Amino acid sequence: MYLTLLKSKLHRACVTHIELEYEGSCAIDSVLLSTAGIQEYEQIHIYNLTNGERFVTYAIRAEDNSGIISVNGAAAHKACPGDRLIICTYAVFERSEMDSFKPLLIYLDDRNFITHTGNAIPVQVA
């Protein structure tokens, strides 16, 4: 049996730009891509915490240490500068691989710099 699991997450990324006329995609600071293990052109799922929009696109590189998160093309209608996003990637695993796998969780500040990382989401309590 195969299961799709969270591979990586950029938590609370802040949109810095929207570029409607750009050729689709989401440009992400190259340091963030590398730290999260996201490949250029890899499919990403974006969850907009500000307005509730959810959409799928692909990642492209933005300048190192720029803090850029630019939502481009048609997806630019789904975000505004200042919106907070969760950007996720997923991977398919065999059940035998699941126990040893841990996702890369990258937590960001208001300027899209890394505050801390992790590999487990805390248990939600009442």
Swiss-Prot record:
GO terms for biological process: alanine biosynthetic process; pantothenate biosynthetic process. It is found in: Cytoplasm. Binds 1 pyruvoyl group covalently per subunit. Substrate binds at T57, G73, A74, A75. The active site is at S25 (schiff-base intermediate with substrate), Y58 (proton donor). One of its GO terms (molecular function) is aspartate 1-decarboxylase activity. Pathway: Cofactor biosynthesis; (R)-pantothenate biosynthesis; beta-alanine from L-aspartate: step 1/1. InterPro entries: Asp_de-COase-like_dom_sf, Asp_decarbox. GO terms for cellular component: cytosol. HAMAP family: PanD. Heterooctamer of four alpha and four beta subunits. This is Aspartate 1-decarboxylase. It comes from Nitrosococcus oceani (strain ATCC 19707 / BCRC 17464 / JCM 30415 / NCIMB 11848 / C-107).
